[in-house]
A protein has these predicted regions:
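A short, structured surface patch at a secondary-structure boundary
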Residues: 53-123
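Bacterial N-terminal signal peptides that target proteins for export
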Residues: 1-11
């Protein structure tokens, strides 16, 4: 059995194994535990024993908390599990890498479902709504990072009026650790992420310049508009964390922007997503970089001519635990290019 200490070591958190006494609120959970979660009051009567991680980020947080033996399934994996979590993940039943059915989840007799995205259990979900789980006595918890989108924008992915930050992720880790009565583990993970975030905050451009970034997730084809990280998205957070800013001004979470608009934005750095899926022609980073270097107009952009092109895990462009890993990937490559100290 994989212990929490061995999991910490595998994730590079071994320095936290010997942490001093955790904060006072990291003691045993008192049940029933009631939380306000994305506009819904959730009451947990006891620590879940048969949880499902519905969506990659939710599943990976549960695994990071060492809860694999309290999980009966996972579903909806846009990319492969973090390598350091592979052993723990192998102990949990994979329902499907795509969208499960409500019936397939209920077949595992779950008592709790951690959900990564509002669309998975929202009013327009084709799988199930939160109230459907409530009716059968299954508690749900939705990632706080994904439930703040405004409702007055037509973009199907919603928008953000303020820059996303890690506090929402820390809240998610803290609340999930309370739900499962492992608050000490939650505090250890949060402490690690905060230390890594603080280290990245020290990154500055070598010439003191405020670098501008475009984060390109994918495009259906070379002639199609690009899906890019919006101004206040996790991508915008990464740019800010590294002392720069997002060149995309749209508040939509995932705006589609034509290449004429990207050329006009004139970013100093283009970050291309690495995706495991093969849905679109430009999903793979190699295809993106080839397009950037061969398109007659795009190849003339200063960022392309200066080879200021870096590759990042596409999941890091979503507001997830991957975001900090992605920021570290970008920082390492920019330092190698001489753009960051």
């Amino acid at each position: 059995m994989t212990s929490f200490k061995s999991l910490l070591a595998a994730c590079g958190l071994s320095a936290l194994i010997g942490l001093a006494a955790p904060p006072s609120h990291a003691g045993s959970t008192v049940y029933p535990l009631t939380l306000e979660n994305c506009g819904t009051q959730v009451t947990i009567k006891k620590a879940p024993e048969r949880a499902i991680g519905f969506g990659q980020n939710s599943a990976e947080i549960l695994l990071l908390l060492g809860l694999q033996d309290k999980m009966v399934g996972t579903a909806f994996w846009p990319s492969k599990v973090l390598p350091q979590l592979a052993e723990a993940n192998a102990r949990v039943k994979l329902l499907t890498v795509e969208m499960p059915t409500f019936e397939s989840m209920l077949a595992e007799n779950p008592d709790f479902v951690a959900v990564a995205l509002p669309s998975l259990v929202g009013p327009n979900s084709k799988i199930a709504k939160r109230e459907d789980f409530d009716k059968v006595g299954v508690s749900t918890y939705l990632s706080p990072s994904t439930c703040l989108s405004t409702k007055n924008v037509k973009d199907q992915y919603g928008s953000r009026g303020e820059l996303w930050n890690m506090d929402l992720l820390y809240k998610e880790i803290d609340e999930l650790s309370q739900i499962f009565d492992v608050a000490d583990r939650g505090q250890a993970l949060i402490a690690d992420f905060k230390a890594r975030e603080a280290k990245l905050r020290g990154s500055v451009a070598k010439d003191g310049q405020n670098l501008s970034y475009v984060f390109w997730f994918s495009s259906p084809s070379p002639s199609a508009d690009a899906y890019v990280g919006g101004k206040n998205s996790a991508s915008g957070f990464i740019a800010d964390l590294l002392g720069g800013h997002n060149a995309i001004a749209a508040e939509a979470e995932w705006p589609t922007v034509g290449w004429e608009g990207i050329i006009a934005a004139n970013p100093d750095v283009i970050v291309v997503a690495s995706l495991d899926r093969n849905r679109w022609e430009l999903d793979k980073p190699e295809a993106k970089i080839n397009f950037l270097n061969t398109d007659p107009a795009v190849s003339q952009m200063p960022a392309v001519k200066n080879k200021a092109l870096v590759v990042m895990d596409g999941q890091a462009m979503n507001p997830t635990i991957r975001t900090i890993y992605g920021a570290e990937q970008v920082a390492e490559q920019l330092k190698a290019l001489g753009l960051l100290k």
